[in-house]
């Protein structure tokens, strides 16, 4: 028996539209918050520094209200450095037939991207300032439908699913958006939570699949992609240990595989001071180069420190990369200090 997923999607969305057919929103609250980050970064190896000073600032507008049918609505819009609108999100809770789950129309990130590196860190990931890591991202950056159930069947496991009908960020009403005509739907789901009967042990699993419609052309447009990741993190007292493995596979006319392992350890010296060591090993194999066994391993190592005093946080990062950007004999290093 063949099941037409597109028809099922249409039926599901039609039912959803019916359950969300409301007439008015009661008055709610609107607030504006912001953040500012000042940094100093010095690079070495293949890269040059230029001006080491940087600043990032962001404003977030949030609002909330309640519909006539009792469904709660929350909205969020971020405004970036260039004073341009960026990610937006509309979240519904209390939707009929969905129980405690939330439903969102969002471009604020995808479930699998949120767990791309869950090893414990004091300040920044090992790949934050050097190299270029191909990690799992799913439909991150695109506008889609997100379903989140924080506690599935009382198990403590969080279910987070995301569907993106083609690529592109949020567009105007009745408009469309797209990055590339070849990329179609993205489906992804993650499961995260505590491991039963083992205090301090957390787990996470995630999978993402992206379709491409150009199935017969001898180009990269005909290659579908799959991503998967799994992690374990254990904490006892101020000590945390973590390990993770991710795979990103693009197949079709050829196969490009990224196999990445993450390891990290952090220690909270006090309530205000934490330190961590992180390492990443990522291997790229490309069958289109004529050798299925060929691969370039990109390695990252970093030490980071975080100190908090009142509302201010100071972070320090010392990171190195070898075979950066999956290119042999290309090395980079970075030393950064950041105040938030």
What are the roles of these predicted feature ranges?
Residues 1-340:
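Outer-membrane beta-barrel proteins
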